[in-house]
A protein has these predicted regions:
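N-terminal cap/lid segment of alpha/beta-hydrolase-fold proteins
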Residues: 2-46
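Short beta-strand/loop motif that positions the catalytic acidic residue
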Residues: 209, 216-218, 222
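The serine-hydrolase catalytic nucleophile loop
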Residues: 58-71, 228
Length: 288
């Protein structure tokens, strides 16, 4: 087991500490717009440098996965739950590509010396987690950043899949649920996806993430991001020999995993623990 996590508190309250666990507003400026969210950290009894999780919401962001965020905080993680630009009070315009840029920015933000020192972050233990369209956000961000320790995809949604199949209707139906978002309309979001049609195709991410620690959750009753949506990518990952931790977890749930929350939280924590229990690989494949 990792020395940085206390899995026994995954579903149990922590004892009192001189400096209790707490939270604050997340406020950063990305692309000239203020992005808001929540930042939470564990109690002071966690003495070692802490793992950090950036948890990205989907489209339009109703499902926040707060239960997962609180559970990961209890076992020792610093957790950021941002609202993407144009979503839920954050400034700016909502676009799929902006969500990817937000995730990249936040990863670099938590790696800054000021953030690391203030929240006692282990820079070698940063994870990206994303649900639905947030799965695309973190998957594409993982291709762009250096030193990411692991990636968790929760029913990841490939925004290019239906367009590449020349079947725009299901995507348009999903986008119509985003009336709460500040955007230039469905047409603008669609055009943004079309501009990144080849960039964001899930299976094309393979060369960039094939040796990354990854845990992917699919829901067998999911009609929004069915398991087949990630299958081309996962088939390539399965055929590739790697020393990293790569797990596919199939749950008997619909898109929000509403009847499998305990299992989802437990398996996510076990994945983080398995990754952190291993030495951090260096650029040449050796271990620290």
């Amino acid at each position: 087991m990792s020395e940085q996590l206390s899995l026994e508190y995954l579903f149990k309250d922590r004892p009192p500490a001189a400096t209790p666990a707490d939270y604050d507003m997340l406020c950063v400026k990305v692309g000239g717009a203020e992005l808001y969210g929540e930042l939470m950290w564990p109690d002071g009894n966690y003495k070692k440098d802490r793992p950090c999780v950036i948890l990205c919401h989907g489209y339009p962001g109703v499902a926040r996965n707060d239960d997962l965020a609180f559970a990961l905080r209890r076992i020792g993680c610093v957790v950021l739950t941002p609202h993407h630009r144009g979503a839920w009070g954050s400034q700016g315009t909502y676009l799929i590509s902006n969500c990817v840029e937000d995730a990249v920015y936040l990863y670099n933000y938590v790696q800054s010396s000021s953030f690391r020192e203030k929240y006692h972050i282990d820079p070698c233990a940063v994870f990206l987690i994303g649900h639905s369209m947030g799965g695309n956000s973190v998957l594409q961000a993982a291709r762009k950043v250096k030193g990411l320790r692991g990636l968790v995809l929760l029913a990841p949604y490939d925004p290019t899949r239906f367009l590449r199949d020349r079947n725009e209707a299901p995507l348009r139906t999903l986008l119509e649920t985003g009336f709460i978002l500040h955007s230039d309309g469905i047409g603008a979001i669609l055009e943004d996806i079309k501009r990144h049609l080849e960039d964001y195709a899930f299976e094309d991410a393979y060369p960039d993430i094939k040796d990354l620690n990854i845990c992917c959750f699919t829901a067998t009753l999911d009609t929004i991001a069915p398991p087949w949506m990630v299958k081309p990518l996962w088939s390539r990952l399965t055929a590739h020999k790697t020393e990293t931790v790569q797990r596919l977890v199939e749950l008997p749930s619909a898109h929000g995993f509403c009847n499998s929350r305990i299992t989802l939280i437990r398996e996510t924590a076990l994945f983080l623990d398995a990754v952190l229990s291993r030495p951090m690989p260096t650029a040449d494949g050796a271990s620290l």
